């Protein structure tokens, strides 16, 4: 068993599969979750021959108890957990390709996009922290996107991504001094099998030959986990293409992916916790000054 153990949720295809195989290439023991045993086997096969290994675990991330059981199984097998990659996501029926307004979509989209795409990540972080904090080390990564800042897909999609960034930021405050770090990653356009199968040279004007491979995202995460400056980055949102360029990382074909920063209105909303100057006064300090604490209802 490798000394480094990772959990990649939603690892049966796409970004999750790419991250898992890249981590295995870097020597990690990687547990991947998904609802389809057959698709999970595909991820295991994709990592065949790598220095590390991929171990599949079936999990319905809409159920808290199954997430808890996954982390417990990993600890029972290996005694530790060094990396959590929150990638699992549910695509509501008719969501992909939908160009209408938010009020034209079913309200039930909330349960998929924020239930699995947000709640499941929170539950996984809670369980991972119970392992990482006592061992004094670890990294928790949320897979986010530029949809956190710019209108993208639907209102609920953007809400879920902004919440993931804020989650990483606030968790970093509470994890300060424990040796555990949290990050949120803004991925660009990803060259998944679905995108490549369309046979296009560009996607909404963005050249596919400079988009990101799923494995590129995995290389970025592997580099972050080994980065000596990681504690100083904790709580921040990082653009994968920009970090990858800085570290000399490339796609499978050797190309360097482009950042989407200019196309979507700028950079991340949350800097590292170490750079944040909160300056929040206590309730007693506000009362003594005769002021209002600024919080609704306060």
Named regions from a protein language model:
Residues 125-126, 169:
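A short, exposed helix-loop element centered on a Lys and neighboring polar residues
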Residues 26-43:
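Conserved glycine-rich Rossmann-like NAD(P)H-binding loop of the short-chain dehydrogenase/reductase
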Residues 99-111, 115:
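Short, well-ordered secondary-structure patches that form non-catalytic structural/interaction elements
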Residues 90-94, 104-109, 139-163, 168-177, ...:
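Catalytic loop of short-chain dehydrogenase/reductase
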């Amino acid at each position: 068993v490798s000394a480094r153990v990772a959990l990649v949720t939603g690892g049966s295809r796409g970004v999750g599969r790419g991250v898992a195989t890249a981590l295995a290439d870097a020597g990690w023991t990687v547990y991947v979750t998904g609802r389809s045993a057959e698709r999970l086997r595909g991820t295991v096969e994709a990592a065949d021959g790598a220095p590390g290994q991929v171990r599949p675990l079936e999990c319905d991330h809409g159920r808290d108890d199954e997430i808890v059981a996954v982390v417990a199984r990993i600890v029972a097998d290996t005694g530790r957990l060094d990396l959590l990659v929150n990638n699992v996501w549910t695509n509501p029926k008719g969501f992909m390709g939908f160009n209408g307004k938010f009020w034209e979509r079913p309200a039930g989209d909330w349960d998929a996009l924020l239930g699995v795409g947000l709640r499941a990540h929170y539950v996984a972080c809670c369980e991972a922290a119970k392992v990482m904090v006592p061992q004094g080390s670890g990294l928790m990564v949320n897979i986010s996107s530029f949809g956190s800042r710019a209108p993208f897909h639907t209102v609920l999609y953007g809400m879920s991504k902004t919440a993931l960034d804020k989650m990483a930021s606030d968790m970093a405050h509470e994890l300060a001094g424990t040796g555990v770090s949290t990050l949120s990653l803004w991925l660009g356009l990803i060259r998944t099998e679905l995108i490549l199968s369309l046979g296009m040279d560009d996607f909404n004007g963005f050249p596919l030959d400079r988009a990101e491979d799923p494995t590129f995202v995995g290389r970025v995460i592997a580099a972050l986990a080994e980065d000596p400056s990681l504690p100083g980055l904790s709580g921040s949102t990082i653009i994968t293409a920009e970090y990858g360029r800085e570290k000399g990382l490339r796609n499978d074909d050797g190309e360097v992916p482009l950042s989407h920063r200019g196309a979507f209105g700028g950079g991340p909303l949350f800097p590292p916790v170490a750079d944040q100057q909160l300056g929040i006064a206590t309730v007693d300090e506000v009362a003594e000054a005769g002021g209002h604490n600024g919080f609704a209802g306060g």
